[in-house]
Swiss-Prot record:
Residues 1-88, 168-212, 778-849 are annotated as: Disordered. Keywords: Coiled coil, Cytoplasm, DNA-binding, Iron, Metal-binding, Nucleus, Phosphoprotein, Transcription, Transcription regulation, Virulence, Zinc. Residues 56-70, 171-184, 778-827 have a biased composition (Low complexity). Transcription factor which plays an essential role in virulence by activating the transcription of iron uptake genes such as FRE7 in iron-poor environments such as the host bloodstream and internal organs. Promotes commensalism in a mouse model of gastrointestinal infection. This is Transcriptional regulatory protein SEF1. GO terms for molecular function: DNA-binding transcription activator activity; DNA-binding transcription factor activity, RNA polymerase II-specific; transcription cis-regulatory region binding; zinc ion binding. Residues 90-120 bind DNA. Disulfide bonds: none annotated. CDD domains: fungal_TF_MHR, GAL4. Residues 71-81, 191-212 have a biased composition (Polar residues). PROSITE patterns: ZN2_CY6_FUNGAL_1 (PS00463), ZN2_CY6_FUNGAL_2 (PS50048). Its main location: cytoplasm. GO terms for biological process: biological process involved in interaction with host; cellular response to alkaline pH; DNA repair; DNA-templated transcription; filamentous growth; intracellular iron ion homeostasis; positive regulation of filamentous growth of a population of unicellular organisms in response to biotic stimulus; regulation of cellular response to iron ion starvation.
Length: 917
């Protein structure tokens, strides 16, 4: 602010020398004259003009009137007249509003400046700055410091700039030689630019200074532009900002270089294929996304690379992105919504992991949740200023994307907690979550997904968070009533949402349905309450398998989000448990086995280049294969549980909520492993009962096999393997050279026809194995089986009554097996079951095969696998049975040799701590 009036003189203490009568006395009432003159009328009078002229003359003639006046130095400049009272305090004391004696101590400094060693200066034009201005200056200084730190620490960028400058100078002067110009040419940059953001100082980790190297780099001459501190996706989407984006020719992360055109292809692939599963970001180009957030950009590129025929790019980026996330989120606390969105994407399409504890997705979700709370995402954009003071240029849609990010964090928290069997840390809803139920601006699928996750949170809070029991579960006697109410509420929610059938939302709805059934199957629940949910669990699981089997026709399994893949995994584990249970209806057993085989082949039938990738898909396939080996080697582990009349469907685990199903099956694998170690070197006794194993083959790839999937009218998905022409020709050539049966990747060719159904065993058995009193084996068309429809609602209600009468029927079966069998055979229409015996002498009573395997006294052995008529004619039964047996013996050789280390699926389960019961 400029002053229109002259500055008041500041004089030292009065001296004995006579003063000029025209000079006003300093710091005395004489000072009031100019103040009073200011208050007078602005009309010019001769008297006023004469006073002003005298005052200006006296001011100009006074040597001590210059300003700013440093104490002890004569003033050297004049100032405009002000008319205010003279300034007697130094600038420091005026800024802090404290008493100052600078005028009294002149020419010495005031007491405070003298004590603090400051330069005491009196400046009438100085005006104290406001607090907000100081804060703004501090922000500017911090930003400058960050830029300086980046330039000083980043040697490569400075070297590149200097070399570029020298090269230009040399080319202009044309004085340097070829070798000198080559030295001056910028080298192929081994850029180690660390990840920088608008809210964290740059981090550069050199190889000789830190064990964690920086992995981020970008090839561009201009310095890196900082992200918008608003952190909202739409803040950079204005036309002005798009024009200001720095052009980027290629993107570099560690040793991975991605050209711009390739980055745009992967960016568009993600936006069209993957983003609809969880629409939480908006982006128009790869360059725009990179300028928003490097971590978000690379997370999108990593996810889109799942569609590549070769996993080279995906595997190269996986470890680098994990390191980048550590640099971004742990070394410095990010304040960016984009970082939260990147963590969500990395949790929905997880990084490669071999064991459960190796999966860092749950930690990413927890970090995203904590950052969201710190940034105020749970309170919406209306209160953003209460959580951050540096929000800049909020876009018109910033609140929308911030809200979607918070909704996605809530969904991921509920899903991953259920997957791991942990109570969710977000166990209550808020305004944004409740409003999302009716918010029509949200995409329908996303809104339905959030509504289902809210119900999922309620389900776990009611059934799995209790303070009256150490396992946290609801009292067993109260579970049936609560589950019945929750099941009806879920059905009302389905009617209200009206989601599309056969889509991802129905898959997640059925997954929650299975969670309700799992709570009913936990130990302690009365048996009569468990059997009510057996049919519901079977129908939900087979429906999930059918839907996903159709979805993979349009998108590969590995590209599906984790919440769909986990639904399939949970379904196959549920079916595996149910098909060994005494409570599953007989006619559902074959269908359950075929669905299990379908899922295993779906998980294993991938491209050969991707077969070594370790993730949740490969882990599920390994668990199924190990469970199948338990069926083959130690069937008593399952039989003992099934024969116990009081045992639950889930027999042991209960403290992992709905994940207890997975841990219960893993216990069976570890128990079989423990027994194999104890039986090493001993002659293994043949079990009295042997369960027909499932036709699992882990050597199947899309290069050698094609899968043909069909769905019967009753909802059963059946998958058969068909070898490719190339694989068939190679198998024939090997078989001709070695005079061995046809095999493809070690799999006998006749075994490819097996789909998991036990009826195939009946069709392949020779007539000599049938007992004399049994009817002859007849062939029945498959159309009769396909005419079975899904059980109606009345049949599901009758199922509980059938299960309650089951024990009485079993007792009568044991007392009069022959009469019971004849009665069942006569009452049935054209028979779908048949009686066979393990040995010709009929040492065991007859049984009903296939549709109710475990309650019987005999199960088919491995040598009764499916055989085509051609194989029967060419080969005898014994060589073929030996071939099948050798196949499974080779797969289980690790159990007996104690060299199989692939059964530690959890990463922490110690089998030596589990005592045999």
């Amino acid at each position: 602010m400029k002053f229109e009036k002259g500055k008041v003189r500041i004089l030292p203490k009065p001296s004995p020398t006579p003063t000029n009568p025209q000079t006003p006395l300093p710091l005395l009432p004489a000072q009031t004259k100019p103040v009073n003159s200011k208050r007078k009328s602005a009309a010019s009078t001769p008297g006023n003009e004469s006073k002003k002229s005298r005052k200006s003359n006296s001011t100009a003639s006074t040597p001590n009137s210059a300003t700013p006046t440093s104490v002890g130095t004569p003033p050297q400049k004049t100032s405009k007249p002000t008319g205010h009272r003279p300034v007697t305090s130094c600038t420091f004391c005026r800024q802090h509003k404290i008493k100052c004696n600078a005028s009294d101590n002149y020419p010495n400094p005031c007491e405070r400046c003298k004590k603090m060693g400051l330069k005491c200066e009196i400046d009438p034009e100085f005006r104290p700055r406001k607090g907000s201005q100081i804060q703004s200056l501090k922000s500017d200084v911090d930003e400058l410091k960050a830029k300086i730190e980046m330039l000083t620490k980043n040697e490569s960028l400075l070297t590149q700039a200097l070399n570029q400058h020298n090269l230009n100078h040399a080319s202009q002067q044309q004085q340097s030689s070829g070798s000198q110009s080559q030295q001056q040419h910028p080298p192929n940059p081994q850029r180690a630019l660390s990840y920088t953001s608008a809210n964290s100082s740059p981090q550069v980790a050199f190889s000789n200074a830190s064990p964690i190297p920086s992995v981020t780099s970008i090839q561009q001459n201009a310095p890196l532009t900082h992200e918008n501190s608003d952190n909202s996706p739409y803040a950079l989407n204005t036309p002005e900002n798009i024009e200001e984006l720095q052009p980027i020719s290629e993107f570099i992360l560690g040793d991975v270089t991605l050209p711009l055109n390739r980055a745009n292809e992967l960016h568009d692939k993600f936006m069209t294929t993957h983003l609809p599963f969880l629409p939480i970001i908006i982006s128009r180009s790869a360059t725009e996304l990179y300028h928003k957030s490097q971590l978000l950009f690379w997370a999108v590129i990593l996810t889109a690379s799942l569609s590549e025929p070769e996993p080279k790019l995906y595997m190269s980026l996986a470890s680098l992105i994990k390191q980048l996330a550590i640099e971004t989120c742990w070394i410095k606390t990010p304040r960016s919504t984009h970082v939260i969105q990147a963590l969500i994407i990395l949790s929905i399409w997880p990084l490669p992991n071999e064991k459960v504890l190796d999966d860092c997705s749950y930690r990413f979700v927890g970090l995203a949740k904590n950052l969201s709370l710190q940034l105020g995402l749970h309170r919406g954009g209306e209160f953003i200023q209460e959580f951050s003071r540096n929000q800049v240029s909020l876009g018109p849609d910033a609140e929308r994307w911030r809200t979607r990010s918070w909704l996605a964090v809530f969904f991921c928290e509920q899903f991953w907690s259920s997957l791991l069997g942990l109570p969710p840390s977000i166990n209550t809803t808020d305004y944004l979550l409740e409003n999302a139920r009716v918010d029509k601006s949200l995409p329908k699928n996303f809104r339905c997904l959030i509504s289902l996750s809210i119900f999922q949170c309620k389900l776990v809070n009611i059934m799995g968070i209790s303070v009256t029991r150490p396992d946290g579960l609801l009292e067993p006697s109260n579970r049936a009533g609560s589950l019945s109410l929750l099941d009806r509420e879920l059905e009302r929610l389905r009617f209200k949402l009206q989601f599309e059938e056969g889509g991802p939302i129905e898959v997640y709805y059925l997954y929650i349905k299975l969670m309700i059934c799992c709570f009913a199957f936990l130990p302690g629940t009365p048996i009569e309450d468990q059997v009510k949910y057996v049919s519901f669990a079977y129908l939900s699981a087979t429906r999930i398998v059918t839907i996903v089997s159709k979805m993979v026709n349009d998108i590969s399994l590995i590209e599906l989000p984790i919440y769909i893949r986990q639904a399939v995994t949970y379904s196959v584990f549920m079916l595996f448990k149910l098909h060994l249970s005494r409570y599953l209806i007989d006619k559902y057993v074959d269908s359950a086995r075929q669905s299990i085989v379908t899922v295993h082949r779906l998980f294993r039938n991938t491209l050969s280049s991707w077969k070594d990738l370790q993730n949740d898909i490969s882990r599920t396939a390994k668990v199924l294969e190990n469970l199948n080996m338990v069926l083959y080697n130690y069937p008593e582990i399952f039989l003992n549980d099934s024969e116990n009349e009081d045992s639950s469907i889930i027999t042991r685990m209960r403290s992992h909520l709905t994940a207890s199903l997975f841990y219960d099956l893993v216990w069976c694998v570890h128990e079989a492993r423990r027994r194999s170690v104890l039986d090493k070197g001993k002659r293994q006794a043949q079990p009295n009962k042997k369960i027909l194993p499932l036709p699992f083959y882990n050597q199947i790839t899309k290069d050698d096999f094609k899968t043909i999937t069909t769905t019967s009218p009753n909802g059963t998905t059946i998958t058969t393997l068909v070898p490719t022409d190339q694989a068939m020709n190679q198998a024939k050539s090997k078989s001709f050279d070695s005079s061995k049966p046809l095999e493809i990747n070690g799999i006998p060719l006749p075994m490819l026809e097996a789909t998991g159904s036990t009826r195939e065993v009946l069709d392949s058995l020779p007539s000599q194995s049938l007992p004399s009193q049994a009817p002859t084996l007849q062939q029945y068309p498959m159309q009769q089986d396909q005419q079975q429809q899904e059980p109606s609602q009345q049949q599901q209600q009758k199922h509980s009554q059938q299960s309650q009468q089951y024990q009485q029927q079993q007792q009568s079966n044991q007392q009069q097996p022959h009469l019971q069998h004849q009665r069942q055979f006569q009452q049935s229409p054209p028979p779908q079951f048949s009686m066979i015996s393990s040995t010709p002498p009929l040492q065991q009573p007859p049984f009903i095969l296939a549709n109710s395997p475990l309650p019987q006294t005999y199960l088919p052995k491995i040598d009764e696998m499916n055989m085509s008529p051609e194989v029967k004619q060419e080969n005898s039964v014994a060589p073929f049975a030996s071939q099948i047996t050798n196949f499974f013996d080779q797969q289980t050789s690790g159990w007996f040799n104690n060299d199989n280390q692939d059964d530690d699926f959890l990463g922490w389960f110690d089998v030596n701590m589990m005592q045999e019961k």
